[in-house]
Amino acid sequence: EDNEYLWNALLDGQIDTIGTDHAPHLLSEKEKSVVFGVPGIETSLALMIDAYNKNEISLELIENVMSNNAAKIFSLDKKGKLEEGYDADIIVVDTNRQWTVKKEEIESKCGWSPFEGYELLGKNYITVVNGNIVYIDGEFDLTVRGDDVSE
């Protein structure tokens, strides 16, 4: 019921952005005390692309709620568009890549995902930050960093 309400609100334009606080607590931490949040940064885009492949959302809406709108709301003047004068922050998604979320493949320190076992269609293939490739098909370039946007 809650999920349906959120999907309808997203599709009706009542939700401006989708993000993740990415709370990568170890399972042992979650078992000991009440800690809020889940690790989600690695799967949020893939889950949305999977929803696109199921005709539940458009690519344009994903682009807006996961990039463009946040850039506008937070006045990140050089972010959120693929145009001259903007930072070259780009993702390339393989919308036809089928894969299964596995804890062994989680990069986050927590080593688990609430979406473990989900079979998804669509995955990030390349990530470019300021014109530099930082990720390509499972491999990271740890020498490249983005800018601090909080300044």
PLM segments and residue spans:
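Active-site glycine- and acidic-residue-rich loops that bind
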Residues: 1-7, 73-75
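Short, flexible, glycine/charge-rich loop motifs used to bind or transfer phosphoryl groups or to couple energy/partner
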Residues: 6-8, 80-81, 117
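General structural signal for secondary-structure boundaries
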Residues: 1-2, 58, 102-103
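A short helix-to-beta-strand connector/capping loop
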Residues: 13-14, 123
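C-terminal cap of metal-dependent C-N hydrolases
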Residues: 87-148
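Short, surface-exposed, polar/charged, turn-prone segments marking secondary-structure boundaries
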Residues: 1-2, 44-47, 118-123
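His/Asp/Glu-enriched, well-ordered alpha-helical/loop segment
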Residues: 11, 17-96
